[in-house]
Amino acid sequence: IIQQVDTPQNLYDKPCNVFVAGFMGSPQMNLINAKVVQSGEDVVLMFGGNTVKLPEGKAQKLIEAGYVDTTVIMGIRPEDLNDSEVIINANPDCVIEATIRVYELLGAEVFLYFDIDEVNCTARVNPRTTARPGDTIKLGIDMTKLHIFDKDTEQVILH
């Protein structure tokens, strides 16, 4: 069954469903169940003891589509997680904590492997990172690159 027909870049950047999101890219997109919660004017995603604030446009789309107080699938590519202190300090509402299981140096980049709610996740970071297995670190999420999928249908809600 053909899931999506598009250019390779659009398949990677704008997958239509969880299957395409997980299939395109290596390492694959991190796909994590998250609860959508409205807190005053803000909408946040809660998962694995972490809470991240959604940008206003994405928050409004979830409110309008009726996803507040439901569980969705949050998708974030490994390269859209960053352990740079500059990025973390600039976006404190979009930071998660993770305990590193595996550190894999690949020359020009490092893959950090960690778990969130028993889901294996990966961050692709700068090779100068000081993170090592056993360390609990902060990772900033590029919320402009966040994907959200319906938990039941696995179809994209927003990119």
Named regions from a protein language model:
Residues 7-8, 19, 84-86, 125-126:
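Short beta-alpha junctions and helix-cap segments that line functional grooves
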Residues 4-5, 103, 159:
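Residue-level detector of high-confidence beta-strand sites
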Residues 38-42, 103-110, 151:
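Short, conserved beta-turn/loop elements at beta-strand boundaries and strand-helix junctions
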Residues 13, 42-100, 130-159:
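Glycine/charge-rich catalytic "coupling/switch" loops of P-loop NTPases
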Residues 44-48, 75, 111-117, 124:
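Short, acidic/hydrophobic/Gly-rich beta-strand patch recurrent on exposed beta strands
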Residues 1-51:
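Internal alpha/beta loop-helix hairpins
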